[in-house]
Amino acid sequence: MQSIYLSKIREQNPLIHNITNIVAANFSANGLLALGASPLMSANIEEMQEVPKISQALVINIGTLIGKDREAMLQAGKTANEVGIPVVLDPVGVGATSYRRETISQLLAEVKFALIRGNAGELAAIAGEAWQAKGVDAGQGEVDLKAVAEKVAQRYGCTVLISGVVDIVSDGTQTATVHNGTSLFPKVTASGCLLSAVCAAFLAVSEGNYFSATLEACVAYTIAGECAAQGLTTQVGQFQIRLLDELAALSPETIGQRGRINE
């Protein structure tokens, strides 16, 4: 594929507002910096009418819901909608508890999302499909994940990215699969959360072309993972650091040469 957006991220240094979980915050912030974006990590409800107005994209991640997080997410999402910046939803573990399900239902009802990014279990839960999730992990199921992606995209008028061994990107009318990646991704906590943040950076410079921006973000991130995993087997600590290095080193040429996509 031809890289369109990576250079724009590095030229524009978009500010990405993250309301994310306590497990992922540091990794997501450093990953955005490595990529060329600028992270802003705030979940303070008192700031949610102001921070989205100075940001170029918003990530809402429900991984560790505490205190007034839900209210802050709703306020930030509505403010982001008002000012016209893309909002990314990461519905971490949505199928695990009733509180998470209620939170996602309310967010989807009151906030317009540009992208929903999650694993198979999370997107199956949103689609109302049977799936045996394992906490915040993907779990197992037998449903057609392409159909799930298309169903959710059509229902909410957004782009959907289902992460897995093969990643699926759909906006309800066009669907693509990405075949890059590494088996070390699931061994590092918050690697999916960082992907959501990376997607937000790509969406921030896409001028509304959310499908193509999500597709390039997914390809870029999974290629960085492949490069980081070279020569490693079980060294997940090294992989985590190398992933940041590879995001910083990633070039449009590498994306064009190494991307494996079926459309």
Curated annotation (Swiss-Prot):
The EC code for this enzyme is 2.7.1.50
Q: Which reaction does it catalyse?
A: 5-(2-hydroxyethyl)-4-methylthiazole + ATP = 4-methyl-5-(2-phosphooxyethyl)-thiazole + ADP + H(+)
BP term (GO), one? thiamine biosynthetic process
Top-level lineage group: Bacteria
Cofactor(s) of this protein: Mg(2+)
- Which InterPro entries did the record assign? Hyethyz_kinase (IPR000417), Ribokinase-like (IPR029056)
The record lists substrate as bound by M41, A190
For the keyword Ubl conjugation, the answer is no
Q: Which NCBIfam families match?
A: PRK09355.1, thiM
- The protein's name is Hydroxyethylthiazole kinase
Q: What is the organism of origin for this protein? A: Haemophilus influenzae (strain PittGG)
Q: What is the lineage of its organism?
A: Bacteria, Pseudomonadati, Pseudomonadota, Gammaproteobacteria, Pasteurellales
Gene name for this UniProt entry: thiM
